[in-house]
């Protein structure tokens, strides 16, 4: 009888370990299967910038090297970007749809950027870096053509939406909006 009790304890412990192993390995698998959506980060920043007319948020969508070049050429580049991009785009949306309360978006689909498009982004980036560019290094490592539906919630006309395509690329490990498209 004591042998059976000892065997039962061992079987119970083994069963608990097996159940724990299945549960914990299943949880880890679930995390791995979740798709990395970090390519949407610059689109999120763009929408937040547009909603709040926030130039600093918008600048998160542009690599620092582009910003440095803009600053070299235009001392007031931030105010230029704000008036020429954010304010104009916001005004255009308001003239089309009415007074805007909220701007959001939904991802419709994404398509991997072609090797040709990535090469073009890479060449532009290296050109921007000039003498600082390492010709043996690849800076642009990934990219997507993301089709989104921009939703403008207005005071008078409810939700209005429009589809658009945004090109995003990954440079030095961070996602940005393409300056070429």
Predicted regions and their residues:
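Bacterial N-terminal signal peptides that target proteins for export
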Residues: 2-14
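Short, low-complexity N-terminal intrinsically disordered segments enriched in polar/charged residues
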Residues: 27-52, 60, 68
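Short beta-strand edge/turn micro-motifs at domain boundaries
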Residues: 157-181
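A short, structured loop/turn motif at beta-sheet edges
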Residues: 137-142, 169-172
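A short hydrophobic beta-strand element
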Residues: 140-152
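Short solvent-exposed beta->alpha transition segments
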Residues: 59-137
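C-terminal motif of bacterial Sec signal peptides marking the signal peptidase cleavage site
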Residues: 22-26
């Amino acid at each position: 009888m004591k042998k059976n009790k000892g065997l039962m304890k061992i079987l119970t412990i083994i069963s608990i370990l097996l159940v724990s192993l299945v549960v914990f390995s299943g949880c880890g698998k679930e995390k791995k299967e979740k798709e990395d959506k970090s390519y949407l980060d610059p689109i999120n920043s763009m929408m937040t910038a547009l909603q709040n007319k926030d130039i600093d948020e918008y600048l998160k969508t542009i690599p620092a090297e582009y910003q440095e070049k803009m600053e070299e050429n235009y001392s007031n580049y931030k105010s230029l970007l704000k008036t020429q991009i954010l304010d104009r785009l916001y005004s255009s949306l308001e003239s089309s749809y009415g007074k805007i309360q909220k701007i959001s978006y939904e991802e419709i689909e994404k398509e991997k950027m072609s090797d040709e498009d990535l090469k073009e982004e890479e060449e532009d980036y290296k050109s921007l870096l000039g003498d600082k560019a390492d010709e043996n290094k690849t800076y642009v490592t990934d990219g997507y053509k993301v089709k989104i539906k921009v939703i403008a919630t207005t005071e008078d006309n409810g939700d209005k939406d429009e589809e658009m395509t945004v090109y995003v690329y990954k440079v030095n490990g961070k996602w940005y909006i393409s300056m070429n498209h």
